[in-house]
Amino acid sequence: KGNKDKKKKNNKDTNKGNNRISIPENWLNDTAEWSYQNTESGIYGIHSTWKPMLDEATKSLKVIHAGVKLGSIKGKDLIPDQSLALCTELHQDTFPKAELSYEDAIQYLRKEAITLPDSLPRGYVLVTYRGIPLGWMKNLGNRANNLYPQEWKIKSSHIPEGNNNLITW
């Protein structure tokens, strides 16, 4: 009897995770200038200027990376990618934003927990410092998950005094 139950569990509907999620064309500026591709590793946008070159390259080469990774699908969620946050073509008004202070921005870049304002809706929030996107947080209401890439986090606990120039041009 136990083996039959295991077999039934293993015969779950494999199409369950293949629900088609629409590609969010409003995430980038000038949407008519972008082509979108849904792959196993995520959803990518490539500017139409480079699309013919990519198509030609894929005929004879293994393309490792092309375009901007917009996000990845996890269950029914489309999780925005860090590269989207850093893309100069990001349409920032599409997402709720949280402007961070210098101290909060450093905490975010250390991948530490920060508190988001109660006025923000649940879901993915673009965090910015002086109007420049740093990345994403997922607002769960009572707390927020820091989605900054683990391998990019600041490991030093030292905060320079007197210089609050996190971003300089």
List the predicted regions and their residue ranges.
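Polybasic, low-complexity RNA-engagement segments
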Residues: 1-169
